Every structure is written in C-alpha cells, then in structure tokens.
Amino acid sequence: MESSSMTTHQEEPLDLSTGNHGNSELSDEQQIMQVMESCGMFLQQNLFAWFLQSMLEASASQPQLTQDEPPENDTKENDLVKQNKSEVNDENESTPSPTQNSRRRTSTGKIDRRMVGKMCTRRYEANARERNRVQQLSKMFDQLRVCLPIEDDAKISKLATLKVASSYIGYLGAILQENSNDEEEFKKQLQVELECAKTLRK
C-alpha cells in the first residue's frame, strides 16, 4: 500500500508540471506576438520619420540647384551673341581690306610668280598621273592579248582587242554550257572580229 501511495504522489507532480508547461508555451507565443507588434510599430514610426526627413532635404536642396544653374534664356542669348560675333569675324576675314588690295597691286610680282609655280607643279603632277595610267592600261591590254587566239606579233587596237575578247569569252562560255547553237554563233562572231582586227592592222 505504501508503495502505491508513493507512486500516486510521484505521478501528481508530473501532471502539474505538464499543465504549467502548456501555460508557459502560450505565454511565450503571446510575448513573441507582442514583440513583433512593437517592432512593427517602431519600424512604421521610423520609416515615416525617415520619409519626412528625406522630403525636407529634397525640398531644401532643390532651390540651391536652380540658383547654381544659369537660366536657359541667358545661355541661348549668349550662344546667339557668340554666333553673331563669329559670323562678323568670318565676314571681315573673307572681305579683303583696301590696304590688302593696294599691297597686291603695288607688289613686285612675287605673288604672281608663286601662283604660276603652283600651277606648273600641279600640271606636272597631273601629267605624271596620266602617263602612269596609260602605261598601266597598256600593260593590261598586253596581258589580255596573250590570252586571246591571235598571233604573237599582231598589233591591234585596244577597241579591236576588247571586241575579240568579248567574242572569245562568249565562245568559251558556250563550250562550258555545252550549248551547240551558242557555240556556233560565238565562233562565227569571233572569226569576224579577228578578220576585222587584221584588216585594221593592215
């Protein structure tokens, strides 16, 4: 009996402890909710205060920026004045003064000699370029005549060389395409051009 009574006494405090544990859990949840609510209120207050402060700073800094920046009308007027000045300077430089004209008239001919010298050098350069171009064309025509079915010592004109070359190219193209009609036509045309080149050479 004593052992049973002791077991009952031991079990009763266990039941009491579990009940207290449930109450403690509820109290912890309530405390957490209270802390979260207080944090939320704190954040709301701080955010509102920060927003007001930033708005005040922005409104205070805006007039300073407008004071530092020059107005648009002033800048436009300054640009127009600068453009007018530059145009006037260009006109003054382009229009020769009477003193300059008199200097040109009373000069001893040095300016004219310089101009003549420049014209001569330009003419020499143009002639040299033309000679170079003609020499290059002659070389190219000589290379083309080597590829054509004409005699090596034949001297035909450049126009006749081009006509023979076009007929010969058409004849070779017809052979590659295996077109007998075009081949015969271009062959006749090539023979005609070769005969014309020979008669012109004589």
Swiss-Prot record:
One cellular component term from this protein's GO annotations in UniProt: nucleus
Stretch list, region Disordered: 1-26, 83-112
Protein name per UniProt: Helix-loop-helix protein 10
Molecular function via GO: DNA-binding transcription factor activity, RNA polymerase II-specific; protein heterodimerization activity; RNA polymerase II transcription regulatory region sequence-specific DNA binding; transcription corepressor activity
Domain bHLH, residue spans: 121-172
Region (Basic motif): 121-134
Gene3D superfamilies listed in its UniProt record: Helix-loop-helix DNA-binding domain
Keywords, comma-separated and alphabetical: Cytoplasm, DNA-binding, Nucleus, Transcription, Transcription regulation
UniProt function note: Probable transcription factor which binds the E box motif 5'-CA[TC][AG]TG-3'.
Reported tissue expression: Expressed in intestine, neurons in head, body and tail, and in body hypodermis, and vulva. Expressed in neurons in the male-specific genital sensilla (simple sense organs) known as rays.
Subcellular location(s) per record: Nucleus; Cytoplasm
Gene Ontology biological process terms from the UniProt entry: developmental process; negative regulation of transcription by RNA polymerase II; regulation of transcription by RNA polymerase II
Biased composition (Polar residues): 17-26
Top-rank taxon: Eukaryota
Major subcellular site: nucleus
Keyword Heme tagged: no
Record-linked InterPro entries: bHLH_dom, E-box_TF_Regulators, HLH_DNA-bd_sf
Subunit structure: Heterodimer with hlh-2.
